[in-house]
């Protein structure tokens, strides 16, 4: 039986993950696969762009699928070829450089781009964006920001959401003053309430970042180059560089041009298939499902799996029913878990709250009819796995509500390893589930380091390393192959985290390169740089 032709428009995290899922289900025997990507690179982890900006990682270190991966898996990649036309009648995709690919099945995974709102002075007389103004979405964006930061005195980041704070985190490692201006009354209003936002603001200010709230940017000052911002309230802020992180806009225009239904994004059904064409699918930030467009990684992974199950006929009934939004991440060196709503929405909603601002600790849970409908954990996220499972499964909660936050003598409300569902995400940065780690151990990897190297779990912000180690030990029945370096915070430095922190303080080491030079004989471990950079921010944020 001849193979069908699958063409994927988009080589970002959504498109490449969807292809990985297809291959994992034997899709190489069913399809010849061709991919188009706007950028001249393989697929990389956009979550780690702030590490590129800060200098903690080189761009080459964040690639999930390097260019060699495509050929090795029989995939024809058209890198740096933006698709400008889809002819659904002829079933052909055409790029701006004239490359054509016929298809039997088409996946659109064009993602999103930085939303740059209209502001006076944004463009030059020629209609181009003024020099010194950047989005924060791609490797090329990072390279431009880094080059500008070398000669910048004061940088302004427009947007105090997750993306804006990641940009600010990256900029503080350069010798320029960093200001964050935000329209809302507190930072990260999609994940935090006012109290949590205030604690985060305080943490940022101790790191030397200036935060300006309730500021609507209406103009950019300067004729040929940026000299400042002007706000709706009449105030101004001097700066010579602007990073716009005010949200994202789905890249759905290609769907509109080929006649697909597009609202905020390309409208899809429960199979991630266009509502207009049974041969066209869409996943990721360019897809709209039941009125929602998802910007977090976990929904993207779920959509990719449903697409792969359906298109390979592994499970023709596979369906995506939407995602309950829950995330665990590290922002400005502060560990954070957020799920569901941040404020009570009904009179019967019950709030359990604990605040310890000096330690940067904040916990808030919203319970409705004995079920968790929202939660914020900041600083101490030891209960996050249990609470996120309760939230995801809509499980009944114990009557002793304080046990949800603290160990108070009642049975500990923490999820055990064996209670973790197979599909539970262990590493949010790289989308690694419990089942993926179990499969890795079954394949013969018997040490935590080997599993981390093979699956990329724990290779992002580093906050899941302990859980990964516990899971590997459980899967190995306690017979883990001992690798001394697994206990080291950095493999090339033979010190556990507390001892490493002590050595850093005693030797006054304030950069990643200084730590490697002093404690590892100059031998650098690239995958450990993000976690080490985060540790340095935590240790020195008051200096």
Per-range role (PLM):
Residues 140, 144-192, 226:
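Rossmann-like NAD(P)H-binding beta-loop-alpha module
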Residues 28-32, 76-94, 101, 172-270:
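A Rossmann-like FAD-binding core segment of flavoenzymes
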Residues 10-13, 137-138, 159-161:
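Glycine-rich Rossmann-fold phosphate-binding loop(s) that bind the pyrophosphate
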Residues 127-152, 220-230, 235-309, 396-411:
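FAD-site-proximal beta/loop scaffold in flavoenzymes
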Residues 1-7, 63-156, 230-232, 243-245, ...:
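FAD-binding core/adjacent interface of flavoenzyme oxidoreductases
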Residues 1-5, 11, 286-385, 408-435, ...:
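Mid-to-C-terminal Rossmann-like scaffold of FAD/NAD(P)H-dependent oxidoreductases
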Residues 101-112, 158, 178, 237-247, ...:
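Short hydrophobic core segments
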């Amino acid at each position: 039986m001849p193979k069908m032709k699958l063409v994927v428009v988009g080589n970002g995290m959504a498109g490449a993950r969807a292809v990985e899922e297809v291959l994992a289900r034997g899709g190489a025997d069913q399809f010849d696969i061709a991919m188009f990507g706007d950028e001249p690179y393989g697929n990389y982890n956009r979550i780690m762009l702030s590490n590129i900006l800060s200098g903690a990682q080189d761009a080459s270190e964040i690639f999930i699928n390097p260019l060699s991966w495509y050929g090795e898996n029989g995939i024809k990649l058209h890198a740096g070829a933006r698709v400008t036309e889809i002819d659904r009648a002829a079933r052909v995709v055409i790029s701006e450089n004239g490359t054509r690919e016929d298809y039997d099945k088409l996946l659109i995974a064009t993602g999103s781009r930085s939303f740059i709102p209209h502001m006076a002075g944004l463009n030059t007389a020629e209609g181009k964006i003024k020099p010194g103004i950047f989005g924060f979405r791609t490797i090329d964006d990072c390279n431009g920001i880094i080059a500008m930061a070398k000669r910048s005195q004061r940088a302004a980041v427009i947007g105090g959401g997750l993306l804006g704070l990641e940009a600010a985190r990256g900029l503080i490692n350069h010798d320029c003053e960093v200001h964050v201006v935000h329209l809302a009354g507190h930072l990260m209003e999609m994940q935090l309430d006012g109290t949590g936002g205030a604690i985060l603001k305080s943490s940022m200010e101790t790191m030397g970042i200036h935060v300006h709230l309730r500021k609507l940017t209406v103009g950019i000052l300067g004729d040929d180059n940026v000299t400042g911002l002007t706000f709706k309230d009449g105030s101004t802020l001097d700066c010579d560089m602007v990073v716009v992180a005010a949200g994202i806009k789905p890249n759905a225009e290609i769907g509109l041009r080929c006649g697909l239904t597009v609202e905020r994004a390309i409208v899809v059904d429960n199979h991630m298939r266009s509502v207009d064409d049974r041969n066209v699918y869409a996943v990721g930030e360019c897809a709209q499902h039941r009125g929602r467009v998802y910007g977090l990684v976990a929904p993207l992974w779920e959509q990719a799996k449903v697409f792969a199950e359906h298109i390979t006929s592994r499970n023709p009934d596979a369906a995506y029913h939407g995602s309950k939004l829950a995330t665990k991440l590290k922002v400005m060196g502060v560990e954070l878990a957020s799920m569901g709503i941040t404020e009570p929405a009904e009179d019967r909603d019950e709030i359990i709250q604990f605040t310890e601002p000096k330690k940067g600790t904040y916990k808030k849970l919203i319970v409705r009819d004995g079920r968790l409908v929202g939660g914020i954990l900041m600083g101490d996220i030891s209960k996050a796995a249990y609470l996120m499972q309760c939230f995801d499964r809509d499980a009944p909660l114990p009557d002793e509500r304080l046990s949800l936050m603290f160990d108070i003598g009642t049975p500990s409300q923490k999820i055990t390893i064996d209670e973790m569902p197979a599909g539970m995400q262990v590493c949010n940065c790289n989308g690694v589930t419990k089942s993926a780690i179990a499969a890795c151990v079954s394949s013969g990897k018997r040490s935590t380091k080997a599993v981390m190297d093979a699956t990329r779990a724990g290779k992002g912000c580093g906050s899941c390393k302990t859980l990964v180690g516990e899971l590997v030990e459980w899967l190995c029945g306690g017979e883990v192959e001992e690798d001394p370096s697994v206990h080291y915070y950095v493999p090339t430095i033979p010190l556990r985290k507390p001892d490493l922190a002590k050595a850093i303080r005693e030797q006054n080491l304030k950069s990643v390169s200084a730590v490697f030079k002093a404690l590892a004989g100059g031998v650098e471990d690239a995958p450990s740089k993000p976690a080490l950079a985060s540790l340095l921010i935590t240790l020195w944020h008051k200096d």
